[in-house]
Amino acid sequence: MELHHPELTYAAIVALAAVLCGGMMTRLKQPAVVGYILAGVVLGPSGFGLVSNRDAVATLAEFGVLMLLFVIGMKLDIIRFLEVWKTAIFTTVLQIAGSVGTALLLRHGLGWSLGLAVVLGCAVAVSSTAVVIKVLESSDELDTPVGRTTLGILIAQDMAVVPMMLVLESFETKALLPADMARVVLSVLFLVLLFWWLSKRRIDLPITARLSRDSDLATLSTLAWCFGTAAISGVLDLSPAYGAFLGGVVLGNSAQRDMLLKRAQPIGSVLLMVFFLSIGLLLDFKFIWKNLGTVLTLLAMVTLFKTALNVTALRLARQDWPSAFLAGVALAQIGEFSFLLAETGKAVKLISAQETKLVVAVTVLSLVLSPFWLFTMRRMHRVAAVHVHSFRDLVTRLYGDEARAFARTARRARVLVRRGSWRDDPNAGPGSGI
């Protein structure tokens, strides 16, 4: 059957797939963003091939990145961040230095190019704000001391993404020129000064007070501010993402913050869905299957390495062991901004298309497995205080409750199937199926 409005039909299919996959992940107590990635996989070349041209959603996905950083900036409570800023900055610097340094050391033994080592090191250093917040919210730990420390580190990492992008872009000239270095230093310095200034006062924007009376204009003005600050940043030869984040920070410390955030979030959620869906379109199962050993080995190395690095950095920051362990495990995945770093590396020819697929594959799998990893390590931390007699005893203590629940569900399903077969077969009796 010929489609008279194929664009509208595809948009409806994309929205339906995102709702179904996002709802399914939420039902399984997983972050909805994992479902959006799954929707992209199902609709993309690795699935049914309904969306074979990723360029069609690339522009909206870029807007999604800007909105994500803008909303993060709006939600940022500078006063609370300043309470943990020393731990957050110290830990983030160690994470970036440790990740990039380790990748550079491993590149000779593993045959990586210099570009892949740099991009992978930067990508591994960043954790997922969306996933970690969702996991901590589900366990009522977001507003605890360890939750606030973890959130502070996530914010510091998000702020570090922009300088890392600027550094990667400078590789296009084969060297970090003084002008590029000055650009990075000035952007970080301006951000620090803005934080210091905003921590002393709350801004009252007269125009937003007037716009608050009209919900449509308030929404439009918020979007205009987001994309306007991003555009100005781009004109100044800085990253548009940097401008969007700064714009969010300014509005987030205004008297009209709650109203503007409420207006911006629905559109931001849609654009964010498109961003994660576009990531799913990038996932190539043929590539993963062909390089399964490499992908799984790198995934295991990254997860274990990040956990150890995070815990070590937090202990050096004088966090107690339980807090360092929980925060370190929660931050063990690779974050959504790693895709942006990988695309930046690809754009400046630091990494090839195949190497980009490797970064994307490891990042997606890391995001999907992150809640399970936190769940497992949390249980192992408890089990460590108990004497374990065997590997079977360890598995029972880790997953015994889930295994028993699964067994009960399986028994009930068997009973229902047998009852159904008795109804279908008039000669069958209650005892015939047992």
From Swiss-Prot:
Keywords: Antiport, Ion transport, Iron, Iron transport, Membrane, Transmembrane, Transmembrane helix, Transport. The chain crosses the membrane at residues 6-26, 31-51, 56-76, 86-106, 113-133, 176-196, 269-289, 294-314, 321-341, 357-377. InterPro entries: Cation/H_exchanger_TM, FeTrans_MagA, K/H_exchanger, Na+/solute_symporter_sf. Pfam families: Na_H_Exchanger. It is a multi-pass membrane protein. The keyword Transmembrane helix applies. It is found in: Membrane. Disulfide bonds: none annotated. This is Iron transporter MagA. Iron transporter, which is required for the synthesis of bacterial magnetic particles (BMPs). Probably involved in the transport of iron from the environment into the cytoplasm across the cell membrane, and then from the cytoplasm into the BMP lipid vesicle across the BMP membrane. Induction: Induced by low iron concentrations. One of its GO terms (molecular function) is antiporter activity.
